[in-house]
UniProtKB/Swiss-Prot annotation:
One of its GO terms (cellular component) is plasma membrane. This is Nucleotide-binding protein Rv0566c. It comes from the Bacteria. The keyword Protein transport does not apply. Nucleotide-binding protein. It comes from Mycobacterium tuberculosis (strain ATCC 25618 / H37Rv). InterPro entries: DUF520, UPF0234-like_C, UPF0234_N, YajQ-like_sf. Keywords: Nucleotide-binding. The keyword Ubl conjugation does not apply. Belongs to the YajQ family. HAMAP family: YajQ.
Length: 163
């Protein structure tokens, strides 16, 4: 029997993030407590979101609204990293970045976790910004997926190419 495998990746569906951003922008435009604060949310480049408002409290609340919309769209908050509010003139601004890809540090943590706690006949390979897990038994692969979902890692994980 051939080996079964799957890949562990950390990718965010940009269209879902765009939908969450548009929903947050709509809510910020219509909510009573944001009236007159000139609160806005927009893309800044390809992988960053910029929120601006007239007060520090309102910009923090806008970040919370955006995070709420990300959760509703099934996007892990581990994939979004918001910065601190910065004063710029009469407005406050927060820039948040989307984190994609598994860093080499996190890939090493994942492979070590699988080696230490996972089934014994499971092999891992680091391939750029993803990790491939192979085994002869599919049950072992499913056990690895369950273990990684329970593990507290600081990166959002998706499991793709399950064969």
């Amino acid at each position: 029997m051939a080996d079964s495998s799957f890949d562990i990746v950390s990718k965010v569906d940009r269209q879902e993030v765009d939908n969450a951003l548009n929903q947050a922008a709509k809510e910020l435009a219509t909510r009573f407590d944001f009236r007159g604060t000139d609160t806005k949310i927009a893309w800044k480049g390809d992988e960053a979101v910029e929120l601006t408002s007239s007060t520090e409290e309102r910009v923090k609340a806008a970040v919370d609204v955006f995070k709420e919309k990300l959760i509703r769209r099934d996007i892990s908050l581990k994939a979004f990293e918001a910065g601190e509010p910065q004063a710029s003139g009469k407005t406050y601004k927060v820039t948040g970045a989307l984190k994609q890809g598994i860093s080499s540090e996190n890939a090493k943590k994942i492979t070590k976790l699988i080696r230490d706690a996972g089934p014994k006949n499971v092999k891992t390979q680091i391939q750029g910004d993803e990790v491939r897990v192979t085994s002869k038994k599919r049950d072992d692969l499913q056990a690895v997926i369950a273990m990684l979902k329970k593990a507290d890692l600081d990166v959002a994980l998706q499991f793709v190419n399950y064969r």
